[in-house]
Amino acid sequence: LTPAQQYGLGLRAGLALRQLHALPAFADAKPWEARFNAKMDAKIRAYRDCPIRFRGGERLVEYIQDHRTLLRGRPQGFQHGDYHCGNMTLTQDLRLGVVDFNRMDSGDPWEEFNRIVWCAAASPAFAAGRVDGYFDGPVPEAFFPLLLLYIASNQLSSIVWAIPFGEGEVQTMLRQAEQLNAAYEGFTRTVPLWYEQGRRLAGCEGGTGN
């Protein structure tokens, strides 16, 4: 597939996610700010107790501590729970499908982008299309700083999660940590390089958004 085709599939994946998020949160969903702050606290403790560290880990902890206020007032809706290209299907005529709903939950819709790093590793154009397709217009200014908060939280727990599955999974997560560090240039920026690269490869003009 050409980068433009990959971007087009990303647009469809973003639209599908937006449609999922139009569904209401579960009635028993607890307040998001308190719930996710508790989750981040647990992940920071687990990372610091883990014998395996990765480059940039403490920068992620600092970013989390400095940006907790971004959670304030965030809405909640239905979540797929594991939305990335590994849980999508593609037919020969390029029809996109979404599978693996066994982790469905309620939460901030934008948290669903926390696994977009898998998409970016496979295709920057697809990942950029996912973002643009979700918003169908200019990307809100608040999105990328909050995206980094959610990605940082997810990455911190990745090594701890991988250890029981063996050395191969640990190495995969360490490589992902390196890719993350590169995408954010040592966490000195909030818009990841893959977003700009993906749009450029797909022939999109301008900076962020359509």
Regions found by a protein language model. Name each.
Residues L60-E62:
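Short proline/glycine- and basic residue-enriched helix-capping loop/turn segments at helix->loop/beta transitions
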Residues L1, Q92, N102, W110, ...:
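Short, flexible helix/strand-to-coil boundary loops that buttress conserved ligand/catalytic motifs
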Residues A22-F26, T69, Q76, V139, ...:
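Generic structural signal for secondary-structure transition and capping sites
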Residues L1-R55, R74-Q76, D105-S106:
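A cross-family kinase active-site recognition segment
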Residues I64-F113, G207-N210:
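Active-site acidic catalytic loop and adjacent metal/ATP-binding pocket
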Residues A13, L17-L20, M40, Y83, ...:
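Generic structural signal for small/hydrophobic residues in well-ordered secondary structure
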Residues Y7, L11, R72, R115-N210:
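Helix-rich C-terminal or lid/interface subdomains of diverse kinases
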